[in-house]
Regions:
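Short, amphipathic alpha-helical interaction segments positioned at domain boundaries
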Residues: 363-376
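Minor-groove-contacting beta-hairpin "wing" of winged helix-turn-helix DNA-binding domains
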Residues: 355-362
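A short, conserved structural fragment
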Residues: 343-354
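Short active-site-adjacent structural elements
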Residues: 317, 350, 369
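Short amphipathic alpha-helical interaction segments
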Residues: 327-344
């Protein structure tokens, strides 16, 4: 495992140098299951992240994901000592039968113990992930799960409606009659979950995310608003957008494209390349073990709108104009086009905040996001 940590650390150093990064606005250690790292490896990874930039503020949102069965006092202490201040716990559902039906390794007892340890030892914010519509899940189960997380201090909850993806174990089990899936009931459960969370005082600030005001995810917010992000580790993805003006992209102004890179999923190949890697700015870059995608401004604009309309705030008129040199109202058809039609149906609206005009979907309109994106 130490070879892998060294490889990740070296890639971070390379990316920071290549894209002229001076500081991080947020850090997210995801997975995979980073909570399986032993305390020494986790400490080494955190130290490497913090030392890779010129300045690392302790106030930076620093998140780590964890599965309940891997949470321990040692893990929590190592994470906190390393600067992590936000813990995301993947609960999904706290019923043993439901968990077994989707092949989860965790159990209800392990979930309860993980939350007990978090309440006892964790000084930062903790968040929980749930899924609505799992096989054999009931309304009572979802209600109890959300209440459990809220009563134990989770200030941010992600709630996803289950959708079957072809080729997954769950899809195969459903096809074989071993598990059940009802898309309509999944949507019904999700709507119930939204009602419950809003009753607790949570704000529905993104299509699948709810928060006690003031505890929004800064890392996810950057992703939704097309901020640049680096991805290090096997299978990780990073994107540097043209519209953010990164100096590295200006080296070839004729190209006028951003870049997205997806690291190889082959862990051995990843480690063999990166564990001894060294590079200094100005040196020729060797062929990297990743797939590269050039992103033109048309694609960037499409993704900007797609991600922005996922949020309750929506897309800002001034930000859009500064980034793409276009009028947002005209692009969306605010008067007689697609946005105008949705607005007449009370599925979209225009709001103003701090002098900025925002175009967004209403609470009801967010339920039909995919249809809206097709129409615009």
């Amino acid at each position: 495992m130490r070879d892998y940590i060294d490889a990740v650390s070296n890639q971070i150093k390379f990316l920071v140098a290549r894209f002229c990064v001076k500081e991080f606005s947020s850090v997210y250690i995801g997975g995979g299951t980073p909570s399986i790292l032993d305390e020494q490896d986790l400490s080494a990874l955190c130290a490497s992240i913090k030392s890779s930039v010129d300045a690392f503020s302790e106030a930076v949102e620093f998140t780590i994901e964890a599965n309940p069965e891997t949470v321990s006092e040692g893990f929590l202490e190592a994470a906190q000592s390393g600067g992590v201040n936000r813990l995301s716990l993947g609960i999904q559902c706290a019923d043993d039968g439901v968990l077994k039906s989707v092949g989860r390794r965790t159990s209800r007892a392990q979930i309860l113990e993980a939350v007990r340890l978090i309440k006892k030892n964790w000084r930062g914010q903790w968040c929980a992930d749930f899924i609505a519509g799992l096989p054999f899940q009931t309304k009572a189960m979802l209600r109890d799960d959300l209440d459990f997380a809220f009563q134990n201090g989770a200030a941010h909850i992600s709630l996803y409606a289950l959708s079957l993806e072809e080729g997954t174990p769950l899809a195969k089990n459903v096809a074989a009659g071993v598990a059940e899936y009802d898309a309509d009931f999944a949507d019904e459960l999700w709507l119930l979950g939204r009602e419950i969370l809003e009753g607790f005082g949570f704000s529905h600030y993104e299509i699948s995310n709810f928060t006690i005001p003031g505890h929004e995810s800064k890392h996810n917010g950057g992703y939704w608003h097309l901020r640049d992000y680096l991805g290090a580790g096997a299978g990780a993805v990073g994107t540097i957008w043209m519209g953010n003006g990164n100096p590295a992209l200006k080296e070839n102004p004729a190209q006028k494209k951003g870049v997205r890179f997806a690291n190889t999923h082959d862990i051995r190949k990843y480690v063999n390349f990166w564990k001894e890697f060294e590079w200094r700015h100005g040196e020729e870059i060797p062929r990297l073990p990743c797939e590269l995608e050039a992103i033109d401004l048309q694609t960037e604009e499409k993704e900007f709108l797609m991600m922005g309309f996922r949020t309750s705030v929506g897309v800002g008129e001034n930000e859009y104009r500064a980034r793409f040199g276009k009028d947002l109202a005209e692009r969306l058809g605010a008067e007689s086009g697609a946005f105008g039609r949705w607005r007449k149906k009370n599925l979209a609206h225009v709001t103003e905040k701090n002098g900025e005009v925002f175009y967004s979907l209403t609470r009801e309109g967010l339920l039909f996001l995919n249809r809206f994106l097709i129409e615009i």
